[in-house]
């Protein structure tokens, strides 16, 4: 629901005015942070930096790509001639299974110089053998295979971490496009397993628990999803299996999307029914196709899955709720991006276009209007 207030025109008449027409702040209950919304700035001229627009990849197999089947990676290893998804250990991991502890395994008692050794593993998951086939262009069955891969890695890595420690997290994510620091255009994502729960998911779960404790155990994201489905003004697309994609009320990025269940509590992707998983594959394709169609370009983004940090031992009592965050940088066109700088680094996030307007534009960006890559041909490198 969009808040309104009244405005006097000088007489005794008061007319309702939407807060979307004025500068205001919105609160993000997931992270306990605010975002400053400045609708009038959408009209300002732009003479700043412009990016080189991304060009669609049209080569099914690139002999120089480190991720294509049969190719040699920088380590000298050769990829197998894989036909579906392909998972392997990251050649340049940010975490190590057994890092050398510096000084002591204990956290320092000094509040100003605290540190602790951590361990973990980093994996790469290639979504498809074809170099040119993004998730938006895949068949639903192929996206389902990606989801199966995520489930397998989450379960396997989670089991290893649970055997080693009582704490930890398996974080699944994808960076798409050079603008988001992606070094290879081949469709792929990453899985980082950590011996700790990172700040973002940890904060979300803390706020889920706090919300539930004051509301007879109800779940924040499920309550929020149901209200968004009822209001519809920020809904981008919805699937009858129980998934809804919205530009969240508190979105910081211009065309940010939050994808979540709206019918029941689902702590992790391991608890999805077959119908829910196919529905998730369908709505993922829908969302990513709308992104590509918005500015008629391969749309850059960072996408991540938040769920129970490790596979839940008791799903019924788990506080997490599975959901996907999409953070795309583009602001006005394929060449103009948003920069999180200045006030946003030193104060709080700020946006120009209101989330409701962003949702309208994404709803109008019909996924079937833009021709996808020809993915009906068999893969033959």
From Swiss-Prot:
Enzyme class label: transferase
rRNA-binding recorded as keyword: no
Pathway: Carbohydrate metabolism; galactose metabolism
Keywords, sorted A to Z: Carbohydrate metabolism, Galactose metabolism, Iron, Metal-binding, Nucleotidyltransferase, Transferase, Zinc
Transmembrane parts of this sequence: none
Catalytic residue list: 188
Gene3D superfamilies: HIT-like
Cofactor note as given: Binds 1 zinc ion per subunit. Zinc binding seems to play a structural role.
Catalyzed chemical reaction(s): alpha-D-galactose 1-phosphate + UDP-alpha-D-glucose = alpha-D-glucose 1-phosphate + UDP-alpha-D-galactose
Biological-process GO terms, alphabetical: galactose catabolic process via UDP-galactose, Leloir pathway
Positions of UDP-alpha-D-glucose binding: 90-91, 175, 190, 338-341, 343-344
SUPFAM superfamilies in the cross-refs: HIT-like
Subunit: Homodimer.
NCBIfam families: galT_1 (TIGR00209), PRK11720.1 (NF008724)
Name listed for the protein in its UniProt record: Galactose-1-phosphate uridylyltransferase
Gene behind this protein: GAL7
